[in-house]
Structures are given as C-alpha cells and as structure tokens.
C-alpha cells in the first residue's frame, strides 16, 4: 500500500481515518478511507496487469519532480533505489525538457496535482513508466525491457524489446 490509517475514538466509537491529503500538514486526518482505497485498488490493478509485485512506498515519502512535469502532457516516472531517509527513489520529469532543476515534494503532492500518476508509484526500483496525456503508455522493467505498451504514444526504448504500434498486453 501507499498510506496508513489511524483509529480515532469519536463519541464512544472507533473510526478509521486516512490522512487528509489535501491539507498542507501530514498530521491532519479525516474520518473516511475512500481516497486511500481508490488509489490502492488502482495500484493493485495496475500491478496485476503487469504481473509485478508491489514495492513499499508511503504517501509522506518524497519524490523528485522537475517543475515542467506538473503541467506536461508527456511525463516519465522512474524509480531508483531509495537513498534513505524520506526519499522514495521516485523521479518525475518532462522528457522533452532540458532543465535539470528538481524539487523534493511529498508523494501526497502528486495525489493532489497529478492523481493519475498514483497508479504506478508501487512499482519497484528500476522501473520506468512513460505517460502520454495522463495515461500510462509504456512500462519498462529494471532490465530495460518493455513489459507493456499501448502502441499509440509509447516512445521507442533505447534497448528495443517492443514493436512500435503493437500492444503486448491489453490497455491498462
């Protein structure tokens, strides 16, 4: 999973709360778990279609993001081994940009600003996901093999492994 839940005593009852991802602070919660479960279900579905096991990530861990990636229609997400601390190992970049300016933000900021990218954040280190118009169009594993592509917008992988225009799996 990507988040944690807390139990709160409210008027003599125990309620399950999730973090309030829309707030600036990581400490506030809300008395529901719907947002967390929706993201978790999407992540599990994505991993299942790729036949990949989940790798731990938490909503309050950090991701390095290039400023252009927040608004770009083409986005590349890739994960390296975490250097430790609160870093998840994830990077989010606009592959067409020449800037190398990155900012470190908590993963819940991705949930707020680009929620469509949340599905891929439980992939293990070494994986790369290329997004086109907000949807995954190609996934590469840690051996640089294309394990999924939609055939419409996926770029050619540096090491090959796929046939442009031919999907290996059904669309995600």
For the regions a language model picked out, list residue spans one by one.
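Acidic, proline/glycine-rich low-complexity IDRs
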Residues: 1-172
């Amino acid at each position: 999973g990507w988040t944690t839940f807390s139990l709160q005593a409210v008027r003599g009852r125990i309620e399950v709360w999730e973090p309030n991802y829309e707030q600036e602070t990581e400490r506030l919660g809300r008395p529901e778990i719907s947002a967390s479960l929706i993201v978790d279900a999407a992540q599990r579905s994505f991993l299942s279609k790729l036949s990949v096991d989940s790798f731990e990530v938490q909503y309050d861990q950090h991701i390095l993001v290039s400023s252009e990636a927040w608004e770009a229609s083409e986005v590349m997400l890739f994960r390296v081994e975490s250097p430790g601390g609160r870093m998840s190992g994830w990077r989010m970049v606009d592959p067409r940009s020449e800037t190398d300016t990155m900012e470190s933000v908590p993963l819940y900021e991705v949930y707020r600003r680009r929620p469509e990218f949340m599905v891929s954040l439980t992939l293990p280190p070494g994986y790369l996901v290329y997004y086109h118009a907000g949807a995954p169009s190609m996934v590469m594993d840690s051996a640089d093999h294309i394990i999924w592509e939609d055939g419409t917008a996926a770029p050619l992988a540096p090491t090959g492994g796929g046939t442009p225009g031919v999907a290996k799996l059904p669309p995600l």
